[in-house]
Amino acid sequence: GLTAGLSIHALDSFREYSGLKNTKSVVSGATGGVGSISVMLLSKLGSEVTAVTGKNDQSDFLHSIGASNILSREELAETAKKPIGKSLWDIGVDVASGEVLSLLLTSLSPGGAIACSGLVGGHSFESSIFPFILRGNALIGIDSVEIPLEDKRHAWEHFSHDWVLEGLDKIIKEVPLEDLEVEIESILSGGQIGRVLVKI
């Protein structure tokens, strides 16, 4: 949950702590570990969350953790066919990069921002300058590894106070060590949902 927490904190900071309530947000990779926690947290904070997923059979799961709307990757591509499109979201959490990030950037509202932390969709992306100079949008990189321990502690304190999440059992699967190989194969094939807790 650290990366998700840092992403949400960065977006809140970008909005000068005006709060995330009543915002429209988008989360890519929404069935994964970072994505699912982001959906839950944004929903808890009062944002209307659109979950973007390549797992079209997981709508019930995504609704159960707080997503108001669900878009397939194909539907996302249909919403963004121009360098700058209709304003759909105020903020976003992107774990994919690549084409998905390119598409999300075209649909941000004026003054919007995306916190990007992953590269499962590729290590590069394409964008025009328009979202940045015509709408004042921002792309915020999230580093959850090299940041100071104090910054990590600050995020964890949020989770233990004002960001306490209920229903984590929906996104956590506990497995014995001998089943770890099966879970790794599921991750590599893109079939993993939520987080896996290995019981030793």
Report the location of each language-model feature.
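Mid-domain Rossmann-like dinucleotide-binding core that forms the NAD(H)/NADP(H) cofactor-binding site
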Residues: 1-73
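Local beta-strand N-terminus motif with an aromatic residue
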Residues: 67, 88-90, 132
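Short amphipathic alpha-helix with an adjacent loop that forms part of the alpha/beta core around
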Residues: 76-87
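N-terminal Rossmann-like NAD(P) cofactor-binding module of classical short-chain dehydrogenase/reductase
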Residues: 90-93, 115
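Short, well-ordered coil/turn residues at beta-beta hairpins
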Residues: 94-95, 200
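Glycine-rich phosphate-binding loop and adjacent beta-alpha segment
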Residues: 99-165
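C-terminal hydrophobic helical "lid"/dimerization subdomain
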Residues: 150-200
